[in-house]
């Protein structure tokens, strides 16, 4: 069995995960030279141009006609969109781990950040001079150079008051503030940029930049999850206390008026109730887990069906492992242990299945010896292994697991 601790992270030798999270994460940018050499050669520019034209892909084509004339075109893109291009342009493809499990496995190099914060891997191709302008993002990102070279400038912190160029189809601005980074990234280099920090990348030649994006849920995500929890109540979760009418003091007022003090009183009663309700604590935990394990993009799976005997045969070979498919968002909560995959709570797992998925979500790769040991600890090892192999087939078919 290979555990998470054996994975080599993409940080410099002198920066441990603890140091990075303390001194850099959401505080300041960091250049990591040759931090991810494994990405070099996985894609070439033509691969991305062709992929962007796939009808199932989420892509954007940004054309720069002048400093004040930017146009963006959204998927579906076709070959016609790539004809008569201006000198400066870029094409961006989202959710690239959907199309390359090998690329998706590189998420493990960022395992010092919990996977519930992962968004997706985006790739940007641009010829010399191509860019998407000076901008900032609402999420943290590791920009990895996979092909060619790109010059990156990182400047000021931005917020809701940051002014954008008017009449443009993308959110860009002119004022980068004082530059804190002005570097050319080579293949394999990484640039970490915190959320809301101005940055500007320009292709030095034909280049591919891969963005490993990380983000948090917003309040609307959580409120939506809580609402669904009330609508589809867990039979083990007693939410009847929330069905009781609110008791409000009454003051004289017009017949048709809903007074502000009544609204504020209801708000305070609600907040007090939420703060002292074990049932709501459980519901909120479920809502958070569901929100952060949900994918932004539709999951595409193969039509081919996995065979349990074939899975057994492969896993019995030396060097074969079961691991998480990083195209899936897999996580767990504790007290009690609950497993979530792509926004769903998996509430019908047995003990062995829960243990396997928990370890996969922690970045471990499991071999046949480990899986057999789990089954051998049960009263009926043969039946337990047969059930586990059936489940592994379902996980592979659903895009949750890989057999390597």
UniProtKB/Swiss-Prot annotation:
Binding site for Fe cation: 135, 137, 199
An example molecular function term from Gene Ontology annotations: metal ion binding
Cofactor binding mode and count: Binds 1 Fe(2+) ion per subunit.
Lineage: Bacteria, Pseudomonadati, Pseudomonadota, Gammaproteobacteria, Pasteurellales
Listed EC numbers: 1.14.11.-
Keyword tRNA processing: no
Protein name: Probable ribosomal oxygenase HI_0396
InterPro entries per record: JmjC_dom (IPR003347), NO66-like (IPR039994), ROXA-like_wH (IPR046799)
Sorted UniProt keywords: Dioxygenase, Iron, Metal-binding, Oxidoreductase
Purpose: Oxygenase that catalyzes the hydroxylation of a ribosomal protein.
Cofactor(s) essential for the protein: Fe(2+)
Family from the record: Belongs to the ROX family.
Top-level taxon of origin: Bacteria
Domain JmjC, first and last residues per copy: 102-231
Keyword hit for Flavoprotein: no
């Amino acid at each position: 069995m290979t555990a998470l601790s054996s994975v080599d992270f993409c940080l410099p030798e002198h920066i441990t995960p603890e140091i990075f999270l303390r001194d850099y994460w959401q505080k300041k940018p960091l250049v990591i030279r040759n931090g991810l050499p494994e990405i070099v050669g996985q894609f070439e520019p033509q691969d991305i141009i062709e992929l962007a034209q796939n009808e199932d892909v989420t892509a954007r084509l940004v054309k720069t006609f002048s400093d004040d004339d930017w146009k963006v075109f959204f998927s579906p893109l076709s070959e016609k969109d790539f004809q008569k291009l201006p000198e400066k342009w870029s094409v961006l493809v989202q959710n690239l781990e959907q199309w390359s499990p090998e690329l998706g496995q590189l998420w493990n190099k960022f395992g010092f950040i919990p996977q519930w914060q992962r968004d997706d891997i985006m790739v940007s191709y641009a010829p010399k001079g191509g860019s998407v302008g000076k901008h900032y993002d609402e999420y943290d990102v590791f920009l990895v150079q996979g092909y060619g070279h790109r010059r990156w400038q990182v400047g000021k912190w931005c917020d809701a008051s940051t002014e954008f160029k008017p009449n443009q189809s993308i959110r860009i601005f002119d004022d980068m503030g004082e530059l804190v980074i002005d570097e050319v990234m080579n293949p394999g280099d990484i640039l970490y940029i915190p959320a809301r920090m101005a940055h500007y990348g320009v292709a030095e030649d034909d280049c591919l930049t891969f963005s490993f994006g990380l983000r948090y849920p917003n309040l609307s995500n959580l409120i939506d999850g809580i609402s669904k929890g009330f609508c589809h109540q867990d039979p083990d979760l007693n939410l009847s206390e929330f069905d009781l009418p609110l008791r409000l003091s009454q003051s004289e007022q017009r017949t048709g008026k809903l007074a502000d003090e009544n609204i504020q009183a209801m708000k305070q009663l609600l907040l007090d109730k939420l703060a002292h309700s074990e049932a709501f604590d459980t519901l909120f935990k479920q809502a958070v887990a569901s929100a952060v394990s949900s994918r932004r993009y539709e999951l595409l799976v193969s039509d081919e069906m996995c065979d349990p005997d074939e899975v057994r045969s492969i896993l019995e070979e030396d060097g074969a492992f079961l691991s998480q498919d990083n195209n899936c968002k897999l996580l767990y909560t504790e007290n009690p242990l609950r497993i979530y995959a792509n926004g769903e709570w998996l509430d019908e797992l047995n003990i062995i299945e829960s243990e396997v998925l928990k370890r996969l979500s922690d970045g471990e790769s499991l071999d046949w010896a480990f899986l057999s040991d789990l089954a051998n600890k049960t009263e009926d090892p043969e039946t337990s292994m047969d059930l586990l192999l059936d489940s592994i087939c379902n996980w592979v078919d659903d895009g949750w697991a890989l057999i390597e």
